[in-house]
């Protein structure tokens, strides 16, 4: 073994490379009692590696099945594992697993909702996030401001932002009234607030932003906000093949999951779990659950894969 420490730890399932690089930079990782440095290579697989003082394995989990969740992130949740102020995070509602942990594939701003993928495979997460892979992300965005042919052309051709040139791969107009306009936009990287900053460069303010697609994985219209579903084997392998990883042969869920009755029961189960979570986090101390009970927000309809792509031709585009 002679590889960079963050790569070894990512393959062992302790996080994505970016997450682990941040941990190493902050001095939270040690090797044989010595604080590790970014770029350090691990040559001995018997070395004692600690993260936050806890000994962790550096052996690749070859026999652990790669799992992927599709989560419908609501507005207001933070993409972090722990928040010192006690605010909700995207990890709060995910199912508990033994011997591994969920790793988020990228991030969404607190005020952005929609599809967020999680996986148990750190290498898969890292490759999907890396700009060199050019994995498409599609968003439904509502903007306030004057939008014309010239501005749309700028967004497609490219705009110089603080961190370099950025552009939309596609901009599709879906309607609007007055100064409010709704578009589907596609980008192939995940820079911080990139969609919002692109529109701001054209003097338009984003009033609503929702991710509806990552690669060819679409936000399921049956999924409520705050709900999750585990991807089937074919979808997991689509993501793995997209970034040149070997396909999986097993899955943790049933292969035959097409029954309407089963789908309906699963959807109801997810909704009940979301409701219980909402009641728990919204109950002030000293008050009963019944006194603080409120209804969870209804999931708004979302265009699925068929509607998003097959109806693309029916969306009227502004003249470029």
Swiss-Prot record:
Q: Where is the composition biased (Polar residues)?
A: 300-320
In this protein, the active site sits at: 109 (nucleophile)
- Write down the SUPFAM superfamilies for this protein, in alphabetical order: Alpha-L RNA-binding motif, Pseudouridine synthase
Q: Which reaction does it catalyse?
A: uridine(2605) in 23S rRNA = pseudouridine(2605) in 23S rRNA
Is Transport among this UniProt entry's keywords?
no
- The enzyme's first-digit EC class, named in words, is isomerase
Q: What Gene3D superfamilies has UniProt attached to this entry?
A: Pseudouridine synthase, RNA-binding S4 domain
Residue limits of the S4 RNA-binding domain? 3-68
GO terms (molecular function) for this protein are: 23S rRNA pseudouridine(2605) synthase activity; RNA binding
Q: Disordered: where is this region?
A: 254-320
Q: Which segments show compositional bias classed as Basic residues?
A: 259-275
- Cite the entry's keywords alphabetically: Isomerase, RNA-binding, rRNA processing
Under the heading PROSITE patterns, the entry gives: PSI_RSU (PS01149), S4 (PS50889)
Q: Which Pfam families match?
A: PseudoU_synth_2 (PF00849), S4 (PF01479)
One GO BP: enzyme-directed rRNA pseudouridine synthesis
| E.C. numbers | 5.4.99.22
Q: What does this protein do?
A: Responsible for synthesis of pseudouridine from uracil-2605 in 23S ribosomal RNA.
Which family does this protein fall into? Belongs to the pseudouridine synthase RsuA family.
Its name, as the record gives it, is Ribosomal large subunit pseudouridine synthase B
Q: Which organism is it from?
A: Vibrio vulnificus (strain CMCP6)
Upper lineage ranks?
Answer: Bacteria, Pseudomonadati, Pseudomonadota, Gammaproteobacteria, Vibrionales
């Amino acid at each position: 073994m002679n590889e960079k420490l963050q790569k070894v730890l990512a393959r062992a399932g302790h996080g994505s490379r970016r997450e682990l690089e941040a941990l190493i930079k902050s001095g939270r990782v040690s090797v044989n009692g010595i604080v590790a440095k970014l770029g350090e290579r691990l040559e001995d697989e018997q070395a004692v590696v600690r993260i936050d003082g806890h000994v962790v394995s550096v052996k690749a989990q070859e026999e652990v099945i790669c799992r992927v969740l599709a989560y419908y992130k609501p507005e207001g949740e933070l993409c972090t594992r722990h928040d010192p102020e006690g605010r909700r995070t995207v990890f709060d509602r995910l199912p508990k697993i033994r011997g591994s942990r969920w790793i988020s594939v990228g991030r969404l701003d607190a005020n952005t909702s929609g599809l967020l993928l999680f996986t148990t495979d750190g290498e898969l997460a890292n490759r999907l996030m890396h700009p060199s892979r050019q994995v498409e992300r599609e968003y439904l965005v509502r903007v306030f401001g004057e939008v014309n042919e010239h501005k749309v052309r700028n967004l497609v051709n490219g705009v110089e932002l603080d961190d370099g040139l950025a552009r939309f791969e596609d901009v599709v107009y879906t309607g609007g009234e007055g100064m409010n306009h709704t578009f589907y936009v596609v980008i192939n990287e995940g820079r911080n607030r990139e969609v919002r900053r692109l529109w701001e460069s054209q003097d338009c303010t984003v009033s609503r932003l929702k991710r509806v697609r990552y690669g060819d994985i679409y936000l399921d219209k049956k999924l409520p906000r705050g709900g999750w579903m585990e991807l089937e084997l074919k979808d997991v392998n689509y993501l793995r093949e997209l970034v040149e990883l070997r396909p999986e042969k097993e899955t943790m869920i049933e292969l035959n999951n097409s029954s309407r009755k089963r789908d309906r029961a699963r959807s109801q189960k997810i909704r009940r779990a979301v409701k219980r979570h909402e009641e728990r986090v919204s109950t002030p101390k000293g008050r009963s659950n019944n006194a603080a009970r409120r209804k969870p927000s209804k999931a708004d309809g979302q265009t699925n894969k068929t509607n998003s792509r097959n109806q693309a031709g029916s969306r009227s585009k502004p003249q470029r």
